[in-house]
């Protein structure tokens, strides 16, 4: 097995590892969702919100790992073609040598930077790769969008068969529940007034 073939093997192995990490994140996300339901059932919205943030973070991280796995896999395919055709340039071989340590680190930013270097060795950079990079940089934010958290909380409450607004402890009712309650109160007041007028 030549050096280049060893590096190619490491690339393919890294793609599998990234894919495995993505699946692990999926598992963690499901576990966090189960914790959300339990917290909502106990009426503990603060804990439910924390688990919702964790679930969304795991989901985003899983997507990032999956995306990087696909990207490393695509580079491996290009290396395979270059090796098969005997067209491995010196500069390409240099970049490939630096891959091993970076791939072992499983650091998405370092792997991404390395993939950038490698892709520049190929003349045809497809548009798809650029789109992936843009999407990755926008999804690696550490903050969790609150609307996603709220939607996930509502979804978990629905699955648990709970009314999120009705079962919340006092002082934590959502604005939706409050506006519905006040509308119902207005309607009741009007009916009562009509009944009084009839008597």
Swiss-Prot record:
Residues 180-199 are annotated as: Interaction with VTA1. Residues 10-48, 178-199 form a coiled coil. Residues 170-182 have a biased composition (Polar residues). It is found in: Cytoplasm, Cytosol; Endosome; Late endosome membrane. InterPro entries: Snf7_fam. Residues 183-199 are annotated as: Interaction with VPS4B. Residues 174-199 are annotated as: Interaction with SPAST. The keyword Cell cycle applies. Residues 132-156 are annotated as: Interaction with IST1. GO terms for biological process: autophagosome maturation; autophagy; late endosome to lysosome transport; membrane fission; midbody abscission; mitotic metaphase chromosome alignment; multivesicular body assembly; multivesicular body sorting pathway. Residues 180-196 are annotated as: Interaction with VPS4A, MITD1 and STAMBP. GO terms for molecular function: identical protein binding; MIT domain binding. Probable peripherally associated component of the endosomal sorting required for transport complex III (ESCRT-III) which is involved in multivesicular bodies (MVBs) formation and sorting of endosomal cargo proteins into MVBs. MVBs contain intraluminal vesicles (ILVs) that are generated by invagination and scission from the limiting membrane of the endosome and mostly are delivered to lysosomes enabling degradation of membrane proteins, such as stimulated growth factor receptors, lysosomal enzymes and lipids. Probable peripherally associated component of the endosomal sorting required for transport complex III (ESCRT-III). ESCRT-III components are thought to multimerize to form a flat lattice on the perimeter membrane of the endosome. Several assembly forms of ESCRT-III may exist that interact and act sequentially. Interacts with CHMP1A. Interacts with VTA1; the interaction probably involves the open conformation of CHMP1B. Interacts with CHMP2A. Interacts with VPS4A; the interaction is direct. Interacts with VPS4B; the interaction is direct. PANTHER family: CHARGED MULTIVESICULAR BODY PROTEIN. Belongs to the SNF7 family. This is Charged multivesicular body protein 1B1. It comes from Mus musculus (Mouse).
């Amino acid at each position: 097995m030549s050096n280049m073939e060893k590096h190619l093997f490491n690339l393919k192995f890294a793609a599998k590892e990234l894919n495995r990490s993505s699946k692990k994140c999926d598992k963690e996300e499901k576990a966090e969702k189960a914790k959300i339901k339990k917290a909502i059932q106990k009426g503990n919205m603060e804990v439910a919100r924390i688990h919702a943030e964790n679930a969304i973070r795991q989901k985003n991280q899983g997507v990032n790992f999956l995306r990087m796995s696909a990207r490393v896999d695509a580079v491996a395919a290009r290396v395979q073609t270059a090796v098969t055709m005997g067209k491995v340039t010196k500069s390409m071989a240099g970049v490939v040598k630096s891959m091993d340590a970076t791939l072992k680190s499983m650091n998405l930013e370092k792997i991404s930077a390395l993939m950038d270097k490698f892709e520049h060795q190929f003349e045809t950079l497809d548009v798809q790769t650029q789109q992936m990079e843009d999407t990755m940089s926008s999804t690696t934010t550490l903050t969790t969008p609150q609307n996603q958290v709220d939607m996930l909380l509502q979804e978990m409450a629905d699955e648990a068969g709970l009314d999120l607004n009705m079962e919340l402890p006092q002082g934590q009712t959502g604005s939706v529940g409050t506006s519905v309650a006040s509308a119902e109160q207005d309607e009741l007041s009007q009916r009562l007034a009509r009944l009084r007028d009839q008597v």
